[in-house]
């Protein structure tokens, strides 16, 4: 028996374990279906299957794995349990974020003498996947002001800070532990995200809703929506407040940026002494590769307009101001004049002038800088536009390649510092121009009626310099001694290639005379007289005189500047002109009468009668509609006696009703013979009055006999 049992046990022992398990499961299934063939083996098998196929959410291995991935779920659970028991504290848990805050409106209970006071001052974020934290913060934060998309340094306006309290002690430490950060009473308006987030690990950080308290010496730079005052900072900063050396950011917040700073009447030495290309690093960091190597102009963020300075009735100005305030991608391009032999102070002046001095020629600064003129026409800003215009004229006007032009430039730079010879002419012409507007500017901008409305309309932007506008500073009479030095400098500036932007306004020839009368109070005649002198002096070298651009403000431009007009080589685009010829309107809408159409048809038929007589006789039965060579002619009854050569008006010979025959009812040859017989009678028609009724019942649609249609 033992020998017989060995071979039986041999193959059983040779079966692998996995196969044996499969066989046992099959037996268990068969026993369950067959009514218990092997109850002893089926019971433990059923128990094992029930344990292994439980719900996955309650599986201890899955729970452990989820807690391990969550990164210290036990510590987070302990924190959640602890703060849920505190009255007046609300704890929220979303994935891997635990938010603890005070319930708004809960009456604060008097704290125990030895108990620590808990405030909603931190949000612990641990092990957060990228991209989820910002959405959760936006979800649980109070509604904030709209922000720019795509800027990583956008500022988060803090919620109203609760009353000051001692910082809470660190509770049971989560993993990784949040480093306690110093907290102040409130974040400054220009705080960055780093003021609210404190990184504690590779993917963990602590959020401080009230912001971190930064040092008093630290200068805050913001790149997003912070406040309306810092938005107008770089364009409205005084020339006497120099910024730091390394603070050329797109958004520089001055300490107290006033919206209406008086222009500095000082000399160009009051400009901050910074290197000439100090404005270019921010440009190279913030614009696309198409303009990054470009030192010809400087790109700055456009200042926000101030709605209080715009009158309520000016709908166009307010609409434009709201467009500028809400545009997400607005910037300002300031061309820089390239002076190769100029000393460094003048190069700095060319970079710093548009923001240092507030002149009326910059449309981007009007809404924020020009005050509404009061009762007296000339406020305290009366002499500053003259200085600014003299400086701008020198900045673009001087020929940088000749020594005489440099000497002329130095002479012009000294003129604004000594304003007494210009003050009589300035006071006379600044009063009708409302203090901020000068007659030189009134010629090119008739829309300078309100100080809050920008007036620059750019039709074309060329990359060549317009030296004729640059040589004339915007001074009425005292600028005339500068004329003799102009032609020699213009001959030097004939080759193209300088990077001064030129505005080419499209104007009709008659608008210059219209501006004489419409702006008599602003006295633009000295400027135009100078233009005539300049055109006579320059001769055929220059076609027209155009004002050069100091600033170009782009409102809501492209995200990539490589698509904008600033980087295109040529500005000539295909223009479609839609015009209406007023002289041809009458002939366009004048339709010929039916009698004239009939006469034209008769002449054509007489010419073609010999050629087509045979073919038309064959087709006379079914060719009623094909007999008409003129498309507009309708087969109606014809008054042969009323057809006149000059009968474009009422046909007077409408008495021959008995002689009319419908054209389609007669053969063509007979009808033509009848028409030829009636032709001699057309010369002397009988003077019979016209009938005011339709010709016949069959001809109700033919109203040739009604004179009302022909007068």
UniProtKB/Swiss-Prot annotation:
Residues 157-180 have a biased composition (Pro residues). Belongs to the taperin family. Residues 267-282 have a biased composition (Low complexity). InterPro entries: Phostensin/Taperin_N_dom (IPR025903), Phostensin/Taperin_PP1-bd_dom (IPR025907), PPP1R18/Tprn (IPR026671). Residues 197-206, 283-296, 512-521, 581-590 have a biased composition (Polar residues). One of its GO terms (cellular component) is microvillus. GO terms for molecular function: actin binding; protein phosphatase 1 binding; protein serine/threonine phosphatase inhibitor activity. This is Taperin. The keyword Transport does not apply. The lineage of its organism: Eukaryota, Metazoa, Chordata, Craniata, Vertebrata. It is linked to Deafness, autosomal recessive, 79: A form of non-syndromic deafness characterized by progressive and severe sensorineural hearing loss. There are no symptoms of vestibular dysfunction. Residues 134-305, 328-384, 414-438, 500-535, 572-630, 642-662, 674-711 are annotated as: Disordered. Residues 597-624 have a biased composition (Acidic residues). Keywords: Actin-binding, Cell projection, Cytoplasm, Deafness, Hearing, Non-syndromic deafness, Nucleus, Phosphoprotein, Protein phosphatase inhibitor. Essential for hearing. Required for maintenance of stereocilia on both inner and outer hair cells. Necessary for the integrity of the stereociliary rootlet. May act as an actin cytoskeleton regulator involved in the regulation of actin dynamics at the pointed end in hair cells. Forms rings at the base of stereocilia and binds actin filaments in the stereocilia which may stabilize the stereocilia. Acts as a strong inhibitor of PPP1CA phosphatase activity. Recruited to sites of DNA damage and may play a role in DNA damage repair. One of its GO terms (biological process) is auditory receptor cell stereocilium organization. The gene is TPRN. It holds the Pfam family Phostensin_N. Interacts with GRXCR2; the interaction restricts TPRN to the stereocilum basal region. Interacts with actin ACTB; the interaction may stabilize stereocilia. Interacts with CLIC5. Interacts with PTPRQ. TPRN, CLIC5 and PTPQR form concentric rings at the base of stereocilia and may form a complex. Interacts with phosphatase PPP1CA; the interaction results in inhibition of PPC1A phosphatase activity. Interacts with DNA damage response proteins XRCC6/KU70, XRCC5/KU80, PARP1, TOP1 and TOP2A; these interactions recruit TPRN to sites of DNA damage where it may play a role in DNA repair. The modification Phosphoserine is found at residues 241, 362, 418, 463. Disulfide bonds: none annotated. Expression is detected in fetal cochlea. It is found in: Cell projection, Stereocilium; Cell projection, Microvillus; Nucleus, Nucleoplasm; Cytoplasm. It comes from Homo sapiens (Human).
């Amino acid at each position: 028996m033992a020998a017989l049992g060995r071979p039986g046990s041999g193959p059983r022992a040779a079966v692998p374990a996995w196969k044996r398990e499969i066989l046992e499961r099959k037996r268990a299934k068969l026993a369950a279906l067959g009514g218990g063939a092997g109850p002893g083996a089926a019971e433990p098998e059923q128990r094992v299957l029930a344990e292994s196929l439980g719900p996955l959410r309650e599986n201890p291995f899955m729970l452990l794995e989820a807690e391990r991935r969550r990164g210290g779920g036990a510590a987070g659970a302990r924190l959640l349990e602890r703060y849920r028991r505190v009255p007046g504290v609300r704890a929220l848990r979303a994935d891997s974020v635990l938010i603890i805050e005070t319930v708004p409106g809960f009456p604060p209970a008097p704290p125990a003498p030895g108990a620590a006071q808990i405030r909603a001052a931190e949000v612990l974020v641990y092990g957060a996947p990228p991209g989820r934290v910002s959405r959760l913060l936006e979800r649980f934060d109070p509604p904030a002001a709209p922000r720019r998309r795509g800027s990583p340094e956008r500022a988060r306006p803090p919620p109203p800070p609760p009353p000051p309290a001692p910082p809470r002690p660190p509770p049971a430490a989560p993993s990784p532990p949040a480093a306690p950060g110093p907290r102040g009473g409130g974040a400054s308006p220009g705080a960055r995200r780093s003021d609210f987030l404190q990184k504690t690990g590779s993917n963990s950080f602590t959020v401080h809703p009230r912001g971190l308290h930064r040092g008093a010496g630290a200068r805050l730079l913001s790149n997003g929506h912070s406040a309306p005052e810092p938005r107008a900072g770089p364009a409205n900063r005084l020339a006497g407040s120099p910024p730091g050396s390394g603070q050329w950011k797109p958004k520089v917040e001055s300490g107290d940026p006033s919206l209406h700073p008086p222009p500095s009447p000082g000399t160009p030495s009051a400009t901050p002494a910074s290197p000439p290309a100090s404005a270019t690093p921010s440009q190279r960091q913030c614009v696309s590769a198409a303009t990054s190597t470009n030192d010809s102009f400087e790109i700055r963020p456009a200042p926000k307009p101030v709605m209080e300075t715009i009158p309520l009735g000016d709908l166009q100005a307010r609409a434009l101001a709201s467009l500028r305030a809400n545009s997400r991608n607005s910037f300002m391009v300031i061309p820089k004049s390239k002076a190769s032999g100029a000393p460094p102070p003048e190069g700095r002046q060319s970079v710093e002038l548009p923001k240092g001095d507030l002149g009326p020629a910059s449309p981007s600064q009007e809404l924020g800088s020009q005050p509404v003129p009061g009762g007296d026409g000339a406020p305290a800003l009366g002499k500053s536009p003259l200085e600014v215009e003299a400086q701008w004229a020198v900045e673009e006007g001087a020929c940088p390649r000749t020594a005489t032009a440099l000497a002329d430039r130095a002479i012009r730079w000294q003129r604004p510092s000594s304003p007494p010879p210009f003050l009589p002419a300035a006071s006379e012409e600044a009063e009708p121009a409302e203090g901020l507007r000068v007659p030189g500017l009134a010629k090119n901008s008739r829309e300078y009626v309100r100080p809050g409305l920008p007036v620059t309309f750019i039709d074309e932007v060329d990359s060549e310099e317009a030296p004729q506008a640059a040589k004339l500073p915007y001074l009425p009479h005292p600028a005339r001694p500068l004329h003799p030095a102009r032609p020699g400098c213009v001959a030097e500036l004939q080759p193209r290639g300088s990077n001064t932007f030129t505005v080419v306004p499209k104007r009709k020839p008659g608008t210059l005379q219209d501006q004489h009368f419409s702006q008599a109070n602003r006295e633009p005649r000295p400027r135009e007289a100078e233009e005539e002198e300049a055109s006579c002096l320059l001769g055929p070298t220059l076609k027209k005189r155009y004002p050069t651009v100091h600033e170009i403000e782009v409102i809501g431009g492209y995200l990539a500047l490589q698509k904008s007009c600033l980087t295109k080589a040529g500005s000539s685009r295909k223009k479609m002109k839609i015009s209406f010829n007023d002289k041809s309107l009458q002939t366009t809408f004048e339709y010929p009468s039916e009698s004239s159409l009939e006469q034209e048809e008769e002449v054509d038929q007489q010419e073609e009668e010999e050629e087509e007589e045979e073919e038309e006789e064959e087709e006379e039965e079914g060719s009623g509609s094909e007999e008409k060579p003129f498309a507009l002619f309708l087969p109606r009854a014809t008054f042969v006696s009323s057809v006149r050569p000059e009968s474009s008006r009422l046909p007077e010979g409408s008495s021959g009703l008995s002689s009319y025959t419908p054209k389609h009812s007669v053969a063509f040859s007979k009808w033509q013979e009848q028409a030829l017989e009636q032709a001699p009678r057309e010369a002397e028609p009988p003077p019979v009055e016209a009938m005011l009724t339709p010709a016949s019942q069959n001809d109700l649609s033919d109203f040739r006999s009604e004179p009302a249609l022909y007068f």
